[in-house]
Amino acid sequence: MNQEVMNLFNPQAPAQTFDSIRISIASPEKILSWSYGEIKKPETINYRTFKPERDGLFCARIFGPIKDYECLCGKYKRMKYKGIICEKCGVEVTLSRVRRERMGHIELAAPVAHIWFLKSLPSRIGTLLDMTLKDIERVLYFENYIVTEPGLTSLKEHQLLSEEEYMIAVDEFGEDQFTALIGAEAIYELLASMELEKIAADLRVDLAETTSDLKQKKLMKRLKIVENFLESGNRPEWMIMKIVPVIPPDLRPLVPLDGGRFATSDLNDLYRRVINRNNRLKRLIELRAPGIIIRNEKRMLQEAVDALFDNGRRGRVITGANKRPLKSLSDMLKGKQGRFRQNLLGKRVDYSGRSVIVTGPELKLHQCGLPKKMALELFKPFIYARLDAKGYSSTVKQAKKLVEKERPEVWDILDEVIREHPVLLNRAPTLHRLGIQAFEPTLIEGKAIQLHPLVCTAFNADFDGDQMAVHVPLSLEAQLEARVLMMSTNNILHPANGAPIIVPSQDMVLGLYYLSIVAEKEPGEGMIFADMGELQHALENKVVTLHTKIKGRFKTVDAEGNPVSKIYDTTPGRMIMGELLPKNVNVPFDICNQEMTKKNISKMIDHVYRHCGQKETVIFCDRIMQLGFAHACRAGISFGKDDMVIPESKAKIVAETEALTTEYEQQYNDGLITQGEKYNKVVDAWGKATDKITEEMMARLKAVEFDPVTGRQKQMNSVYMMSHSGARGSVNQMRQLGGMRGLMAKPSGEIIETPIISNFKEGLTVNEYFNSTHGARKGLADTALKTANSGYLTRRLVDVAQDAIISEVDCGAEIGLTMQPIVDAGQIVASIGQRVLGRTALDPILHPVTGEVIVEAGRMIEEKDVEIIEKAGIQSIRIRSALTCETRDGVCAKCYGRDLARGTPVNQGEAVGVIAAQSIGEPGTQLTMRTFHLGGTAQVVDSSYLEASYEGTVKLRNRNVVRNSDGNLVVMGRNMAVLILDATGKERAVHRVTYGSRLFVDEGDTVKRGQRIAEWDPYTRPIMTEVEGYIEFEDLVDGLSVSETADESTGITKRVVIDWRSTPRGSDLKPAMVIKDKAGKILKLSKGGDARFLLSVESILSVEPGAHVKAGDVIARLPMESAKTKDITGGLPRVAELFEARRPKDHAIIAEIDGTVRFGRDYKNKRRIIIEPNDDTIEPVEYLIPKGKPFHLQDGDVIEKGEYILDGNPAPHDILAIKGVEALASYLVNEIQEVYRLQGVLINDKHIEVIVRQMLQKVEITESGDTGYIPGDHVDRIELEEINERLIEEGKKPGSGNPVLLGITKASLQTPSFISAASFQETTRVLTEAAVAGKMDTLQGLKENVIVGRLIPAGTGGMTNQIRRIATARDELIIDERRKTSGSAEANAMLVDMTNNAAE
């Protein structure tokens, strides 16, 4: 086979292609067939002659020659003896390269168990033999005998016997009556004698009969492994090795160092150990040594082989000379430094260089400046070729000399070579695909790469010493892809949200903002200009300034392209900017006739891109950048310390707040409020004070002042300009500079009660400085930790989504998701238009008034449609989604919708999974790197009232209100909502109002915008009565279940329920309040239960026993958690928790059915709650709730399916089980978006949907039917559907399953591709499982193909694959044709069909 390595005369056929890779357990015969000879000696090389020892680990006879075409003794040299085997040294004369591919073997004197199959959990050998790992190890490591053939004795099969027991048994029954063996031989015998078919049949019978869950699971595990062996053709006894393969010597090299020492691969040490022990064992057996010695040697051999395969998996780690653990075969594959991730997934490439970057403002967007020195080095081969072609040199050597001397003709040629040859620039960390872009190089002097300022956002680069790498695409295809797909001019939009990413920032924004300012009373106000010439003239002669109010004529074109003009009220600065706008009917002057903040500039660029296309946009961006820089420079904006204005009213506000806090302190001392309430109120008061001061400060900064002498408007405050324009800085930072720093958070996340009153301009006091170090340190520590976390999250996301590729145009799905605007505390955070833009409509979208069709079903919703939808006030739209897409592998283009980075429908072959993963992962890293910018300044996020966001009429859904003693309307319903309807009766806003809120409006009232609708206490949760009567306490015993704190000075007492289970006497109490009538009878509630209110721990009682209460009065309050600061620190782990589908710590309990709440008998420390269904066909459901948990439902409350019985974050699995896939999707999307939204990061919903789709691919079989699966198996959803369709056609019984939600790590490890899973995590476990099952990897995803070195099946690679498939099919047809030669007509027809399809 290896003879034909380099047959020059008939070059070998190109390496055969393959479509799949299979992994299985190697049988001894297989290992022998690979081997070129047995290694008998542990020697490596002769230390005097440096030649390999014969039969040693580097033996040339077995592995091949050391020098090309030269045998070891030197008798045969050179090509002419190719293939001859030297009779003296036995070495074949061939290429030395074969030393990388030829393997050897070691014949073991005693069998040993393969550690992967023994110790990789669950132990395969253990499961097969139905023995525990401990027992097997006892046998393997020669502690116990095992009975293999009990014969007619009373012993049982698989029974373990110690040395003494064995002796007794031999004495009792005689040696030939039974067989008991020890060591790996025993296990080998047991495995070899297994009849797998019979075992499988028995297990199936047992499975059908067993009732216990535990036993069922155990049987299923065993059945699975038995079936794996049967299907894969592996034999169980192959898990015990009699022959160990030895890998080729060049893969475990021995390198001479200077000074006569050698560096060697650890594997050589491990192999040496095995050979030594093996040889010793052979000798001992020949010498007929005592059993105990042989046994010890066998055990040592087993340990040596274990260490070779997986060092440290069992027993102590074997260390080398320097106390460092030796790297075994497993370690070579594992982890970041292992083969998979180090060399297969990421390789270092040639033709690359790196250097520092500097800004290149005079470059065009598609250019980058490349230092001449670098270019010369990178394009060397091209230069050599061109020098030769032009006749400057005749050999490569001459060319080299020319280039080294840097002769003038070399530079000319370099210019030619570089022209139109794009290079790739990359900045680490490459967090999304915009981290690598193509540019055309222009040669520059100096040694730094010049980068265009507008692409810095995409690379997240700045010029404070960042470095970038340059790569040269060599092949024509690579150059083509770089130019067409990766050129910076083709990446104008951000793939995460479709907004422009080539947007001016910092100085450019400041310059454009300055240009667009309007000032009053400037010279020349009211002048009218006909064209730019006049205007320039006036400006140069200082007749007008850039900010004067003038009338100007703006020239553009109409729809036919004829020039038209219109006069606008504007300023000269804006006219200059308007001059740069592309001439297009859809680009009016209005888009730049406004204050140019960063947001508006972004909108303007987006507008130009949508209406004028890419080329115009690129030119426009370049021009606008030049303009921004020029005017930022001319304006000369900078700021000094007096630009930070401290508001005069600061002292007053601080004094007022201090008075308030003293008052709260007093109230607390008087016992009117609890410690927690005081803390909340103080923090609240200071939060409000900080906001007030900030407002005053901003008002001062914004204020327009006039010069008393000239009457002209004074220059705007520079700090305000920078912040307001979005160039640099935020209101938050300005507040810390000129207002007051405000509240700080402790490292634990709690807010410190005393705020920092000073600002940076005044300087902090020592105490304040100390308090603020908390936040600063936490910020720095966070940054370091979170970068790693975020990178890991991205890695898991990419891994789970890598095979989501657009594989067809339309899957024809008839299901989708319902999109609604996201409303938070009455504010619309994401409008319906933003959410449906670029998605495909599932049903026709109709106008609510006229009923005309706005968007037909199956059409993509564009910007123009969104405008109509928003105007019509449509509140919910059904759209197609990747989540509900029915494509077999991948996603279809219709369900995905618009490709955000291009603004057009998505192309086939686009790797949407990876894009989704990058879009979600990238901000994670950036946010975490930005935590400390707030310096830990706390924000209190709590709203305690609700204002109307629209005008309209009020309608109460599920109205349940009463008037309490104070005459206020109080909400008594658990799921009540306030709706605001417009004149046509359309819903304009929906607000959930919580139980216990005070309502200021009632059904049918009209409200104005901004009017208060309701308010509530954000810090406590009330328990209210709905009947009138007299209070009586039950089981509220002082000191046991209630503690009473009295205040000496006022005598006011406050009762708080304490944990009554902590004392033995109190364990049976059920603290509650009941309401009785005058006669002392317990009143009934409207639902029929008694008016008894059970109290949970920490409830504060608001009434005395015997007090008279009315409906709607609060009888007790439950304090809520105190306000913690919200910051992405909570955010990143939260995102990971959602994607990993973990159960949150105190998760909510969700009602599974509609019904009425009843309290059952309590356990010791759990409360039993029963929901009695409204529907008699359903069984009642019970829940157990820990007694200490704050619990707000009362006996007799009506509850709907999906409502929370116990508050908290719901577990996603529960949502999936109770409310279904759509509810789960919307929950995950909204929760994840919430985290990013807090940080102001925009991510399109579809990215999150793609990831959730990958998490929902499996179903758990509940009814197996005739599918051949076992209940509890995880199967692909689409696979099950296909099998069921087939079974129904054949009239058999289909199987059914429930969708399961897998976390991203779990889902990655469950991919059908074992190569992908092994390169992700837990390499040994994945490979062991795959080998036992004899898995086949069909190379469908991206990762597998990268690893085996093929084009990925996405993008251009996808097309190549498709073409190749068609070609092979056609080739096969043609070959068949030739065989038949009859040339049947139908085959011809098929051929024509296929050719046509291919052409299409």
Swiss-Prot record:
NCBIfam families, A to Z: rpoC_TIGR
Residues binding Zn(2+) 1, per UniProt: C71, C73, C86, C89
Record's subunit section: The RNAP catalytic core consists of 2 alpha, 1 beta, 1 beta' and 1 omega subunit. When a sigma factor is associated with the core the holoenzyme is formed, which can initiate transcription.
Free-text function comment from the UniProt entry: DNA-dependent RNA polymerase catalyzes the transcription of DNA into RNA using the four ribonucleoside triphosphates as substrates.
Single GO MF descriptor: zinc ion binding
Family recorded in the similarity comment: Belongs to the RNA polymerase beta' chain family.
Entry's cofactor comment: Binds 1 Mg(2+) ion per subunit. Binds 2 Zn(2+) ions per subunit.
Residues binding Mg(2+), per UniProt: D462, D464, D466
Enzyme Commission number(s) from the entry: 2.7.7.6
Residues noted as binding Zn(2+) 2 in the record, renumbered to the chain: C811, C885, C892, C895
GO annotations of cellular component type: DNA-directed RNA polymerase complex
HAMAP family with a match to the protein in the record: RNApol_bact_RpoC (MF_01322)
Protein name from the UniProt record: DNA-directed RNA polymerase subunit beta'
Entry keyword set: DNA-directed RNA polymerase, Magnesium, Metal-binding, Nucleotidyltransferase, Transcription, Transferase, Zinc
Cofactor entry: Mg(2+); Zn(2+)
Keyword Oxidoreductase among record annotations: no
InterPro entries, per the entry: DNA-dir_RpoC_beta_prime, DNA-dir_RpoC_beta_prime_bact, RNA_pol_asu, RNA_pol_N, RNA_pol_Rpb1_1, RNA_pol_Rpb1_3, RNA_pol_Rpb1_3_sf, RNA_pol_Rpb1_4
Catalytic activity: RNA(n) + a ribonucleoside 5'-triphosphate = RNA(n+1) + diphosphate
Organism in which the protein naturally occurs: Brucella suis (strain ATCC 23445 / NCTC 10510)
Protein's UniProt keywords contain Cytoplasm: no
